[in-house]
């Protein structure tokens, strides 16, 4: 696994963070060292797939990156005639997802599309995964995407929504940000790396509160919405149609 050193030296003109070739190459290392609880979420996505995916249906992984959630779901699906569609708008990510997924044999077909998730039709879905993806969409586009997902889910279908959160209590928000930075330093990132990546993400990742997510999901129509996992200011929610 290639080590993430992208922000380890001073960058004179620090642009916005993008999921380019450099990020795609080191992404597994970057996400494990940057997102507390990531491996737990990936494992649980497989458990949820085993429980919720039904025969003759589709599973969507929107913002699939290198395919970790797709693979976790596929390993655990027991039903027949299921197809998984993974989507990522980064060509380097989509290419690596194809390579990664095709390295493992399975009877369950996986199609990886390089496209904007807002362009994708959601049809006959028993499960949709948004694993740290919605936060990169413009805030004004989020409800429309969730409405499309809701319409495309079959009754009893599941949405898994993992995100970085902000907290309305400023003291708590600052504490959890600091704990996250401590987590990153404990995983070998320097102060320079932490600060440069934070600056690069500032304009491209707009995060919501847990309550904002819950209210929006309920307003879209989901019958059951709950936070099932949280570590510091990162977490994952489930919404059942």
Swiss-Prot record:
GO terms for molecular function: carboxyl- or carbamoyltransferase activity; S-adenosyl-L-methionine binding. It catalyses: prephenate + S-adenosyl-L-methionine = carboxy-S-adenosyl-L-methionine + 3-phenylpyruvate + H2O. GO terms for biological process: tRNA wobble uridine modification. SUPFAM superfamilies: S-adenosyl-L-methionine-dependent methyltransferases (SSF53335). Keywords: S-adenosyl-L-methionine, Transferase. Coiled coil: none annotated. Its EC number is 2.1.3.-. S-adenosyl-L-methionine binds at residues 38, 63-65, 88-89, 116-117, 131, 198. Belongs to the class I-like SAM-binding methyltransferase superfamily. Cx-SAM synthase family. This is Carboxy-S-adenosyl-L-methionine synthase. It comes from Mannheimia succiniciproducens (strain KCTC 0769BP / MBEL55E). The gene is cmoA.
